[in-house]
């Protein structure tokens, strides 16, 4: 995607991420429907779909590689001086970016795990409403990942990452306080804050990946492994700790421990530097 994006890497990554966001939002609905109507063995249908998509990608991959080379040549002709510069890795700033990735991953994975429980246990809703809240949380990401990519191309990825954290931090703090609100406004505010958190996470998805690949221009594969792979899993390590805190104290109190991670992430974003100024 880095090569296919040409000069619009954020837009390309945002388009690519729509597929993943759609899968997170729609997948559980399909899986639940199949499991309830056909039975657990019906989930084998996902294996068939995976095989079909893998076959299509295998057939089309030579065309994709050819297209990437064509785009590389076009970029080289338009920016001969840029291409002539040797590629460099800026590990210091990638390390700072990793702090942001960690703070976002911890919050996203824990929220993902505890939204249904928070809705049912703390807000007094039905399990169905808890699942619906989770679907809303993922659905907003389908649109905001693409918008985040466009904004990253226009204003630069660092500004969008900062904007994302500026939205996410207060929304996360207020969400933990929602159970103390009046019942009349409790649910509307809860859904509004949930949308803000989902939008904030998705908004910075493409800019984080693009910025990571730019900081490690000589090691794009490694950068992709961190920004695309580790970012999706490392937060899950903290989830059991938060769950234990929820059992010991309360779920809102446990979720409040996520706020300092966002504070650190926001602070780290303020010392990031534009890769263009480092060259």
Where are the model-predicted features located?
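Helix-loop-helix hairpin linking two adjacent transmembrane segments in secondary transporters
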Residues: 16-63
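Flexible cytoplasmic inter-helical loops of multi-pass small-molecule transporters
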Residues: 59-83, 279
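C-terminal transmembrane helical hairpin of 12-TM major facilitator-type secondary transporters
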Residues: 157-208
């Amino acid at each position: 995607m880095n090569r296919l994006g040409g000069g619009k890497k954020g837009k390309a990554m945002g388009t690519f991420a729509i597929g993943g966001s759609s899968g997170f939002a729609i997948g559980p609905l399909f899986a639940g429907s199949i499991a309830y109507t056909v039975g657990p063995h019906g989930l084998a249908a996902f294996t068939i779909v995976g095989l079909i998509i893998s076959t299509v990608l295998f057939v089309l991959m030579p065309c994709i590689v050819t297209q990437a080379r064509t785009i590389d040549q076009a970029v080289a002709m338009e920016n001969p001086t840029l291409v002539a510069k040797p590629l460099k890795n800026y590990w210091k700033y990638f390390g700072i970016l990793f702090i942001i990735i960690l703070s976002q991953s911890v919050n996203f994975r824990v929220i993902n795990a505890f939204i249904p429980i928070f809705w049912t246990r703390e807000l007094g809703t039905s399990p169905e409403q808890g699942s619906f809240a989770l679907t809303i949380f993922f659905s907003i990401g389908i649109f905001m990942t693409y918008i985040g990519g466009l904004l990253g191309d226009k204003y630069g990825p660092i500004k969008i990452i900062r904007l994302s954290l500026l939205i996410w931090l207060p929304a996360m703090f207020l969400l933990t306080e929602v159970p103390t609100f009046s019942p009349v406004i409790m649910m509307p505010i809860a859904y509004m804050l949930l949308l803000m958190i989902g939008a904030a996470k998705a908004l910075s998805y493409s800019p984080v990946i693009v910025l990571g690949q730019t900081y490690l221009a000589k090691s794009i594969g490694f950068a992709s492994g961190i920004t695309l792979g580790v970012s999706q899993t490392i937060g899950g390590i903290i989830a059991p700790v938060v769950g234990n805190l929820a059992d010991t104290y309360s779920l809102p109190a446990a979720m409040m421990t996520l706020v300092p991670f966002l504070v650190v992430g926001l602070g780290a974003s303020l010392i990031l530097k534009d890769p263009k100024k480092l060259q």
